[in-house]
Amino acid sequence: VQRRGADEDPRNQLVFKYAQLVDELYPRYFVMENVSGIAGKRGKTILEELLDKLKNIGYTVHIKLLDAQNYGVAQRRKRYIIIGERSDMGVNYEYPKEMEKHYTVRDVIGSLPEPPEDGSDYPGISLHRRDRLSEINLKRIRTLKPGQGREYLPKELLADCHKIDSSVIGYRNVYGRMAWDEVSPTITARFDSFTRGKFGHPEQDRSISLREGAMLQTFPKDFLFTGSKVDMARQIGNAVPPLLAKQIGTSIIDCYKRSGKS
């Protein structure tokens, strides 16, 4: 569900295409992930209609807001996970239990070497390369300490839109650095850009690399992505973190076993 733009944005109707597929395929279980905004003011009507459709098809529907940092992912990432359980399977589903241990940015990418200055991959680590920052963005990132965002920038380094009223316009976490001993912010489809979030490296004067973003999403260090840089960033940022997906999948398998169905 889009937070901005017209209410009739066609992307807001994609959830109903998903419900149509569920109706046609009629699986024992289904999983659906969506942004937290689906339960907000703009998305609430869409969510209620979606849940009604799924229930009418013949499913018991479970919905819960999960934060990936509670499931072994070093990232603050809140998403609604909707689980559908076909009515003949019984009501057995239980969401994965939260983990006691939390991981940090340092745990995940702290051991990676600094990528070359020339923009090439670090030898043996694909996609671990740096983007060249503009002169103004180099000044901005050099001003910031780990964990700080644009609210710590002096006025002369603020973007023009933030100079108007820095308290209400935009996100305070843009033009920021990650903190070593905290989880990362949500890895989005534009995490490769220093201007799009708190995606600066904690110490080095650069945005995080595609490989670092992928690792914060819990992709294996050698996982391959295809397409342009923009395509790969989108593949990484739009994904459900594999480690979280695995736990959800395991919980469904456990549910199926408890059902006694074959």
Question: Which residue stretches match the model-derived regions?
Answer:
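Class I S-adenosyl-L-methionine
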Residues: 1-168
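C-terminal target-recognition/interaction regions appended to catalytic cores
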Residues: 128-262
